Structures are given as C-alpha cells and as structure tokens.
C-alpha cells in the first residue's frame, strides 16, 4: 500500500434519508475533518474506553473537565449526567483545527447477546435524538463518527 493510500477514505454506502444524504466512509477518523465529531459515550461522559477515550485524550484536559462539570451539575438535581438515548454537545478544545463541535451520544449497551431486547429498541430513539440535535445546529454540514 502506498503511503498516500492510508489517508484515503473508502465510501461504503450513500443513502438519502429524511435528514439529507448520509454517506458512510471508512478510514482513520483522525485523517478527517468536519463540523461535528460524534463519539459513543457512556452516561457519565467520562471517555473511559474506545473511540471516546481517544477523543478525550486528543481534545485534552479541558474536555474532561467540561464533561466532569456536566456530571456534577446533573448530580445536584439527582439526574444521570446523560441518559441513554440522549446526547451532549461540547467544544472540541484541542481538536478545534478539525472540528467545530463534539457530540457525545449515549446509546444502549447492546454488546452482550443475552441482554434485554428492550435495550436494542432504544437504538432508533438514540439516532432520532442525534439527528434532531444536528438539525438544530445551523453550522453543520459534515459529520464524522
């Protein structure tokens, strides 16, 4: 593979949906830029694993502090920091050269086959909430996830 091939993204799918055209491409997320970077988050917004941990690491301590403050404020009212199916928008901090916003999306954990089927039924609501958030953001045309 030539060195320039590493940076190329492969188009897997393009579909029209009620929100516009959705293109699914593959490749290293760090070789892309866009208006929004979407991260799969846990309900504490802690950036503990996977892509979310990488994003927190690259965005810097400011992002960790902001998400920690969101958690503290929600605990004051006895609410989860970010409930399943919901999302939170933050600044990109150290990733601002590539993105305008980060959206932390809390979806249901469906990794184990013996989990309650009701969790899987939360996935459509998670995506609907994400697309509603994106529709409310006036400066978004490219989303990286």
Residue ranges and their predicted role:
Residues 1-145:
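Macrodomain-like recognition of ADP-ribose-binding/processing modules
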């Amino acid at each position: 593979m030539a060195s320039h091939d590493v940076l190329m993204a492969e188009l897997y799918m393009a579909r029209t949906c009620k929100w516009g055209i959705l293109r699914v491409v593959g490749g290293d997320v760090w070789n892309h830029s866009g208006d929004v970077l979407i991260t799969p988050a846990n309900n504490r917004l802690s950036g503990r694993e996977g892509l979310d941990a990488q994003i927190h690491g690259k965005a810097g301590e400011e992002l960790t502090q902001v998400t920690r403050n969101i958690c503290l404020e929600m605990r004051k009212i006895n609410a989860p920091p970010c409930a399943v199916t919901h999302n939170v928008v933050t600044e990109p901090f150290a990733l601002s050269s590539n993105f305008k916003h980060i959206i932390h999306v809390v979806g249901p954990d469906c990794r184990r086959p013996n989990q309650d089927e009701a969790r899987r039924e939360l996935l459509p609501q998670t995506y609907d909430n994400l697309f509603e958030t994106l529709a409310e953001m006036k400066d978004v045309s490219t989303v990286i996830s």
